[in-house]
Amino acid sequence: MKVQFIGATHEVTGSCTLLEVSGRYYLVDCGMEQGEDIFQNVPLPVPANAIEAVFLTHAHIDHSGMLPKLCKDGFRGQIYATEATCNLCRIMLMDSAHIQESEAQWRTRKAERAGERAVEPVYDTNDAAAALRLLRPCQYNAAVQAAEGIIIRMTDIGHLLGSAAIEMWLTEGKQTRKIVFSGDVGNVNQPLLRNPQPVAETEYLVIESTYGDRLHPKERGDVVGELAACIQRALDRGGNLVIPAFSVGRTQEMLYAIREIKQRGLVTGHDHFPVYVDSPLAVEATGIFLQCDPADFDDETRAILKQGVNPIWFDGLKLAVSSDESKIINTDPQPKVILSASGMCEAGRIRHHLKHNLWRRENIILFVGYQAEGSLGWKLENGAKSVKLFGEDIAVNAEIAMLHGTSGHADKEGLLAWLAGFREKPKMVFVNHGDDSSCKAFCATLKSMGYRADAPYSGTEYDLITGKLTTYTEGVKIDRAAAFKGTQRARQIYEDMVAAAEALLALVKTRRGNTNKDNAKLTGQIVSLIEKWKK
């Protein structure tokens, strides 16, 4: 009976842990690495078709995003997750597959022009559909016999709708051991979500450490009050408030806050001000939030629902799905609030909104989530005077603001508070899902408190029956900075190309009634361009 650490070891993304019980193999999470990769991960030591089941803590792509690849490689077992996680995966994995296909198509066209081989996507929509067919919904707090010798129970961990810590009872022969995987531990007092629920006991614990070396500000901001002030300021100036927000989770939290702002009349002089959600994925996710089991929400949200009030819907909310609906937003002169993805401004429709709004002094760009170093959002937060969008240099004249108190992860104190919920200290605590410094710092904190703890690197294996290491690995650093920058650059170029094509189509639609000579000339130029790049 062994546990082997594969991904999110001394890193924040790519969560994946392998369990071996009675010669059978199981995964906890199967996530995609995102952003810069610091340490090399060992490959799965067994083929995908040898994996009998996957246990999924939540739907975020860094925990679920390689499930379609696992299916592509031969996995045919079941994927256990809460019902809300299953519902979110249905949209998030398909969205991820579309991204993989689009990037592969763009790279293939580039490769073929250079006489090179076509680029295959990491996975496609068929692979994502195959993964979705394997989902097995579980209820919170219900013991499930997932396989011979495997019993699981999922406990709400308060990070995202449907997120769970997973308790596992593993039996091999006459020996039973219990291990708990924390998943991502949520912050307390977040909109919509319950606080992380405690787990009573375990022998072994795998715990995240995203913020294991730091504390959130003691004085957490009044999110609703600060957001209302930003809206008031922007609308009073005749400007827009643009909020880059992650499609799933953060967008819905912002809608919850704006609903309260409108209900309490905290913005004055701008009755029925419009709020646009401009992200197809966010629109789908909002639908899932609206349809989920009310028991998944916190007490405050359930009380609102009992009053017949929709907690994330209000007068003036407008959803933009098509590209035409998105474009109309920036042609409408009425002051407004715009929520769009991606949250770090690296891709998606938010880049169009930044292009149209950054240069205007009356506008506000409000960041409500973490901005990774080097991202466009990070550059704006850190005082960039000009940024390049779609091949143009855009002056940053808009006010840049940050909304505090919105983190979805527990800080060091929050992690320790959740850990204190165990009646007795676990025999061993494994620290993962944090960058190198955070992982090491949180592990050191635990040791100073009397815990037996380790922060394993990828490939480290531990025998749960004997309580001893069977394989010990050191972290192997790899130079992926250049490759990461190249990937980000390629994605930005692709986004710029799509935007240019949309602008060309918009131009064509304005030329009805122009002279035949001019229209024929433009048509010829477009056809020539197409023929040139088809080669």
Where are these predicted regions, by residue range?
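His/Asp/Glu-rich metal-coordinating catalytic cores
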Residues: 1-55, 60, 64, 71-253, ...
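A general structural motif
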Residues: 220-224, 313-325, 344-346, 381-386, ...
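A polyampholytic, Gly/Pro-enriched intrinsically disordered region
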Residues: 100-105, 293-307, 470-495
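Short, surface-exposed amphipathic charged segments that create phosphate/polyanion-binding patches used
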Residues: 150-154, 288-296, 416, 466-476
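A short, acidic, amphipathic alpha-helical segment used as a generic capping/interface helix at domain edges
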Residues: 349-352, 407-423
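Hard-cation-handling environments
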Residues: 228-376, 388, 423, 438-440, ...
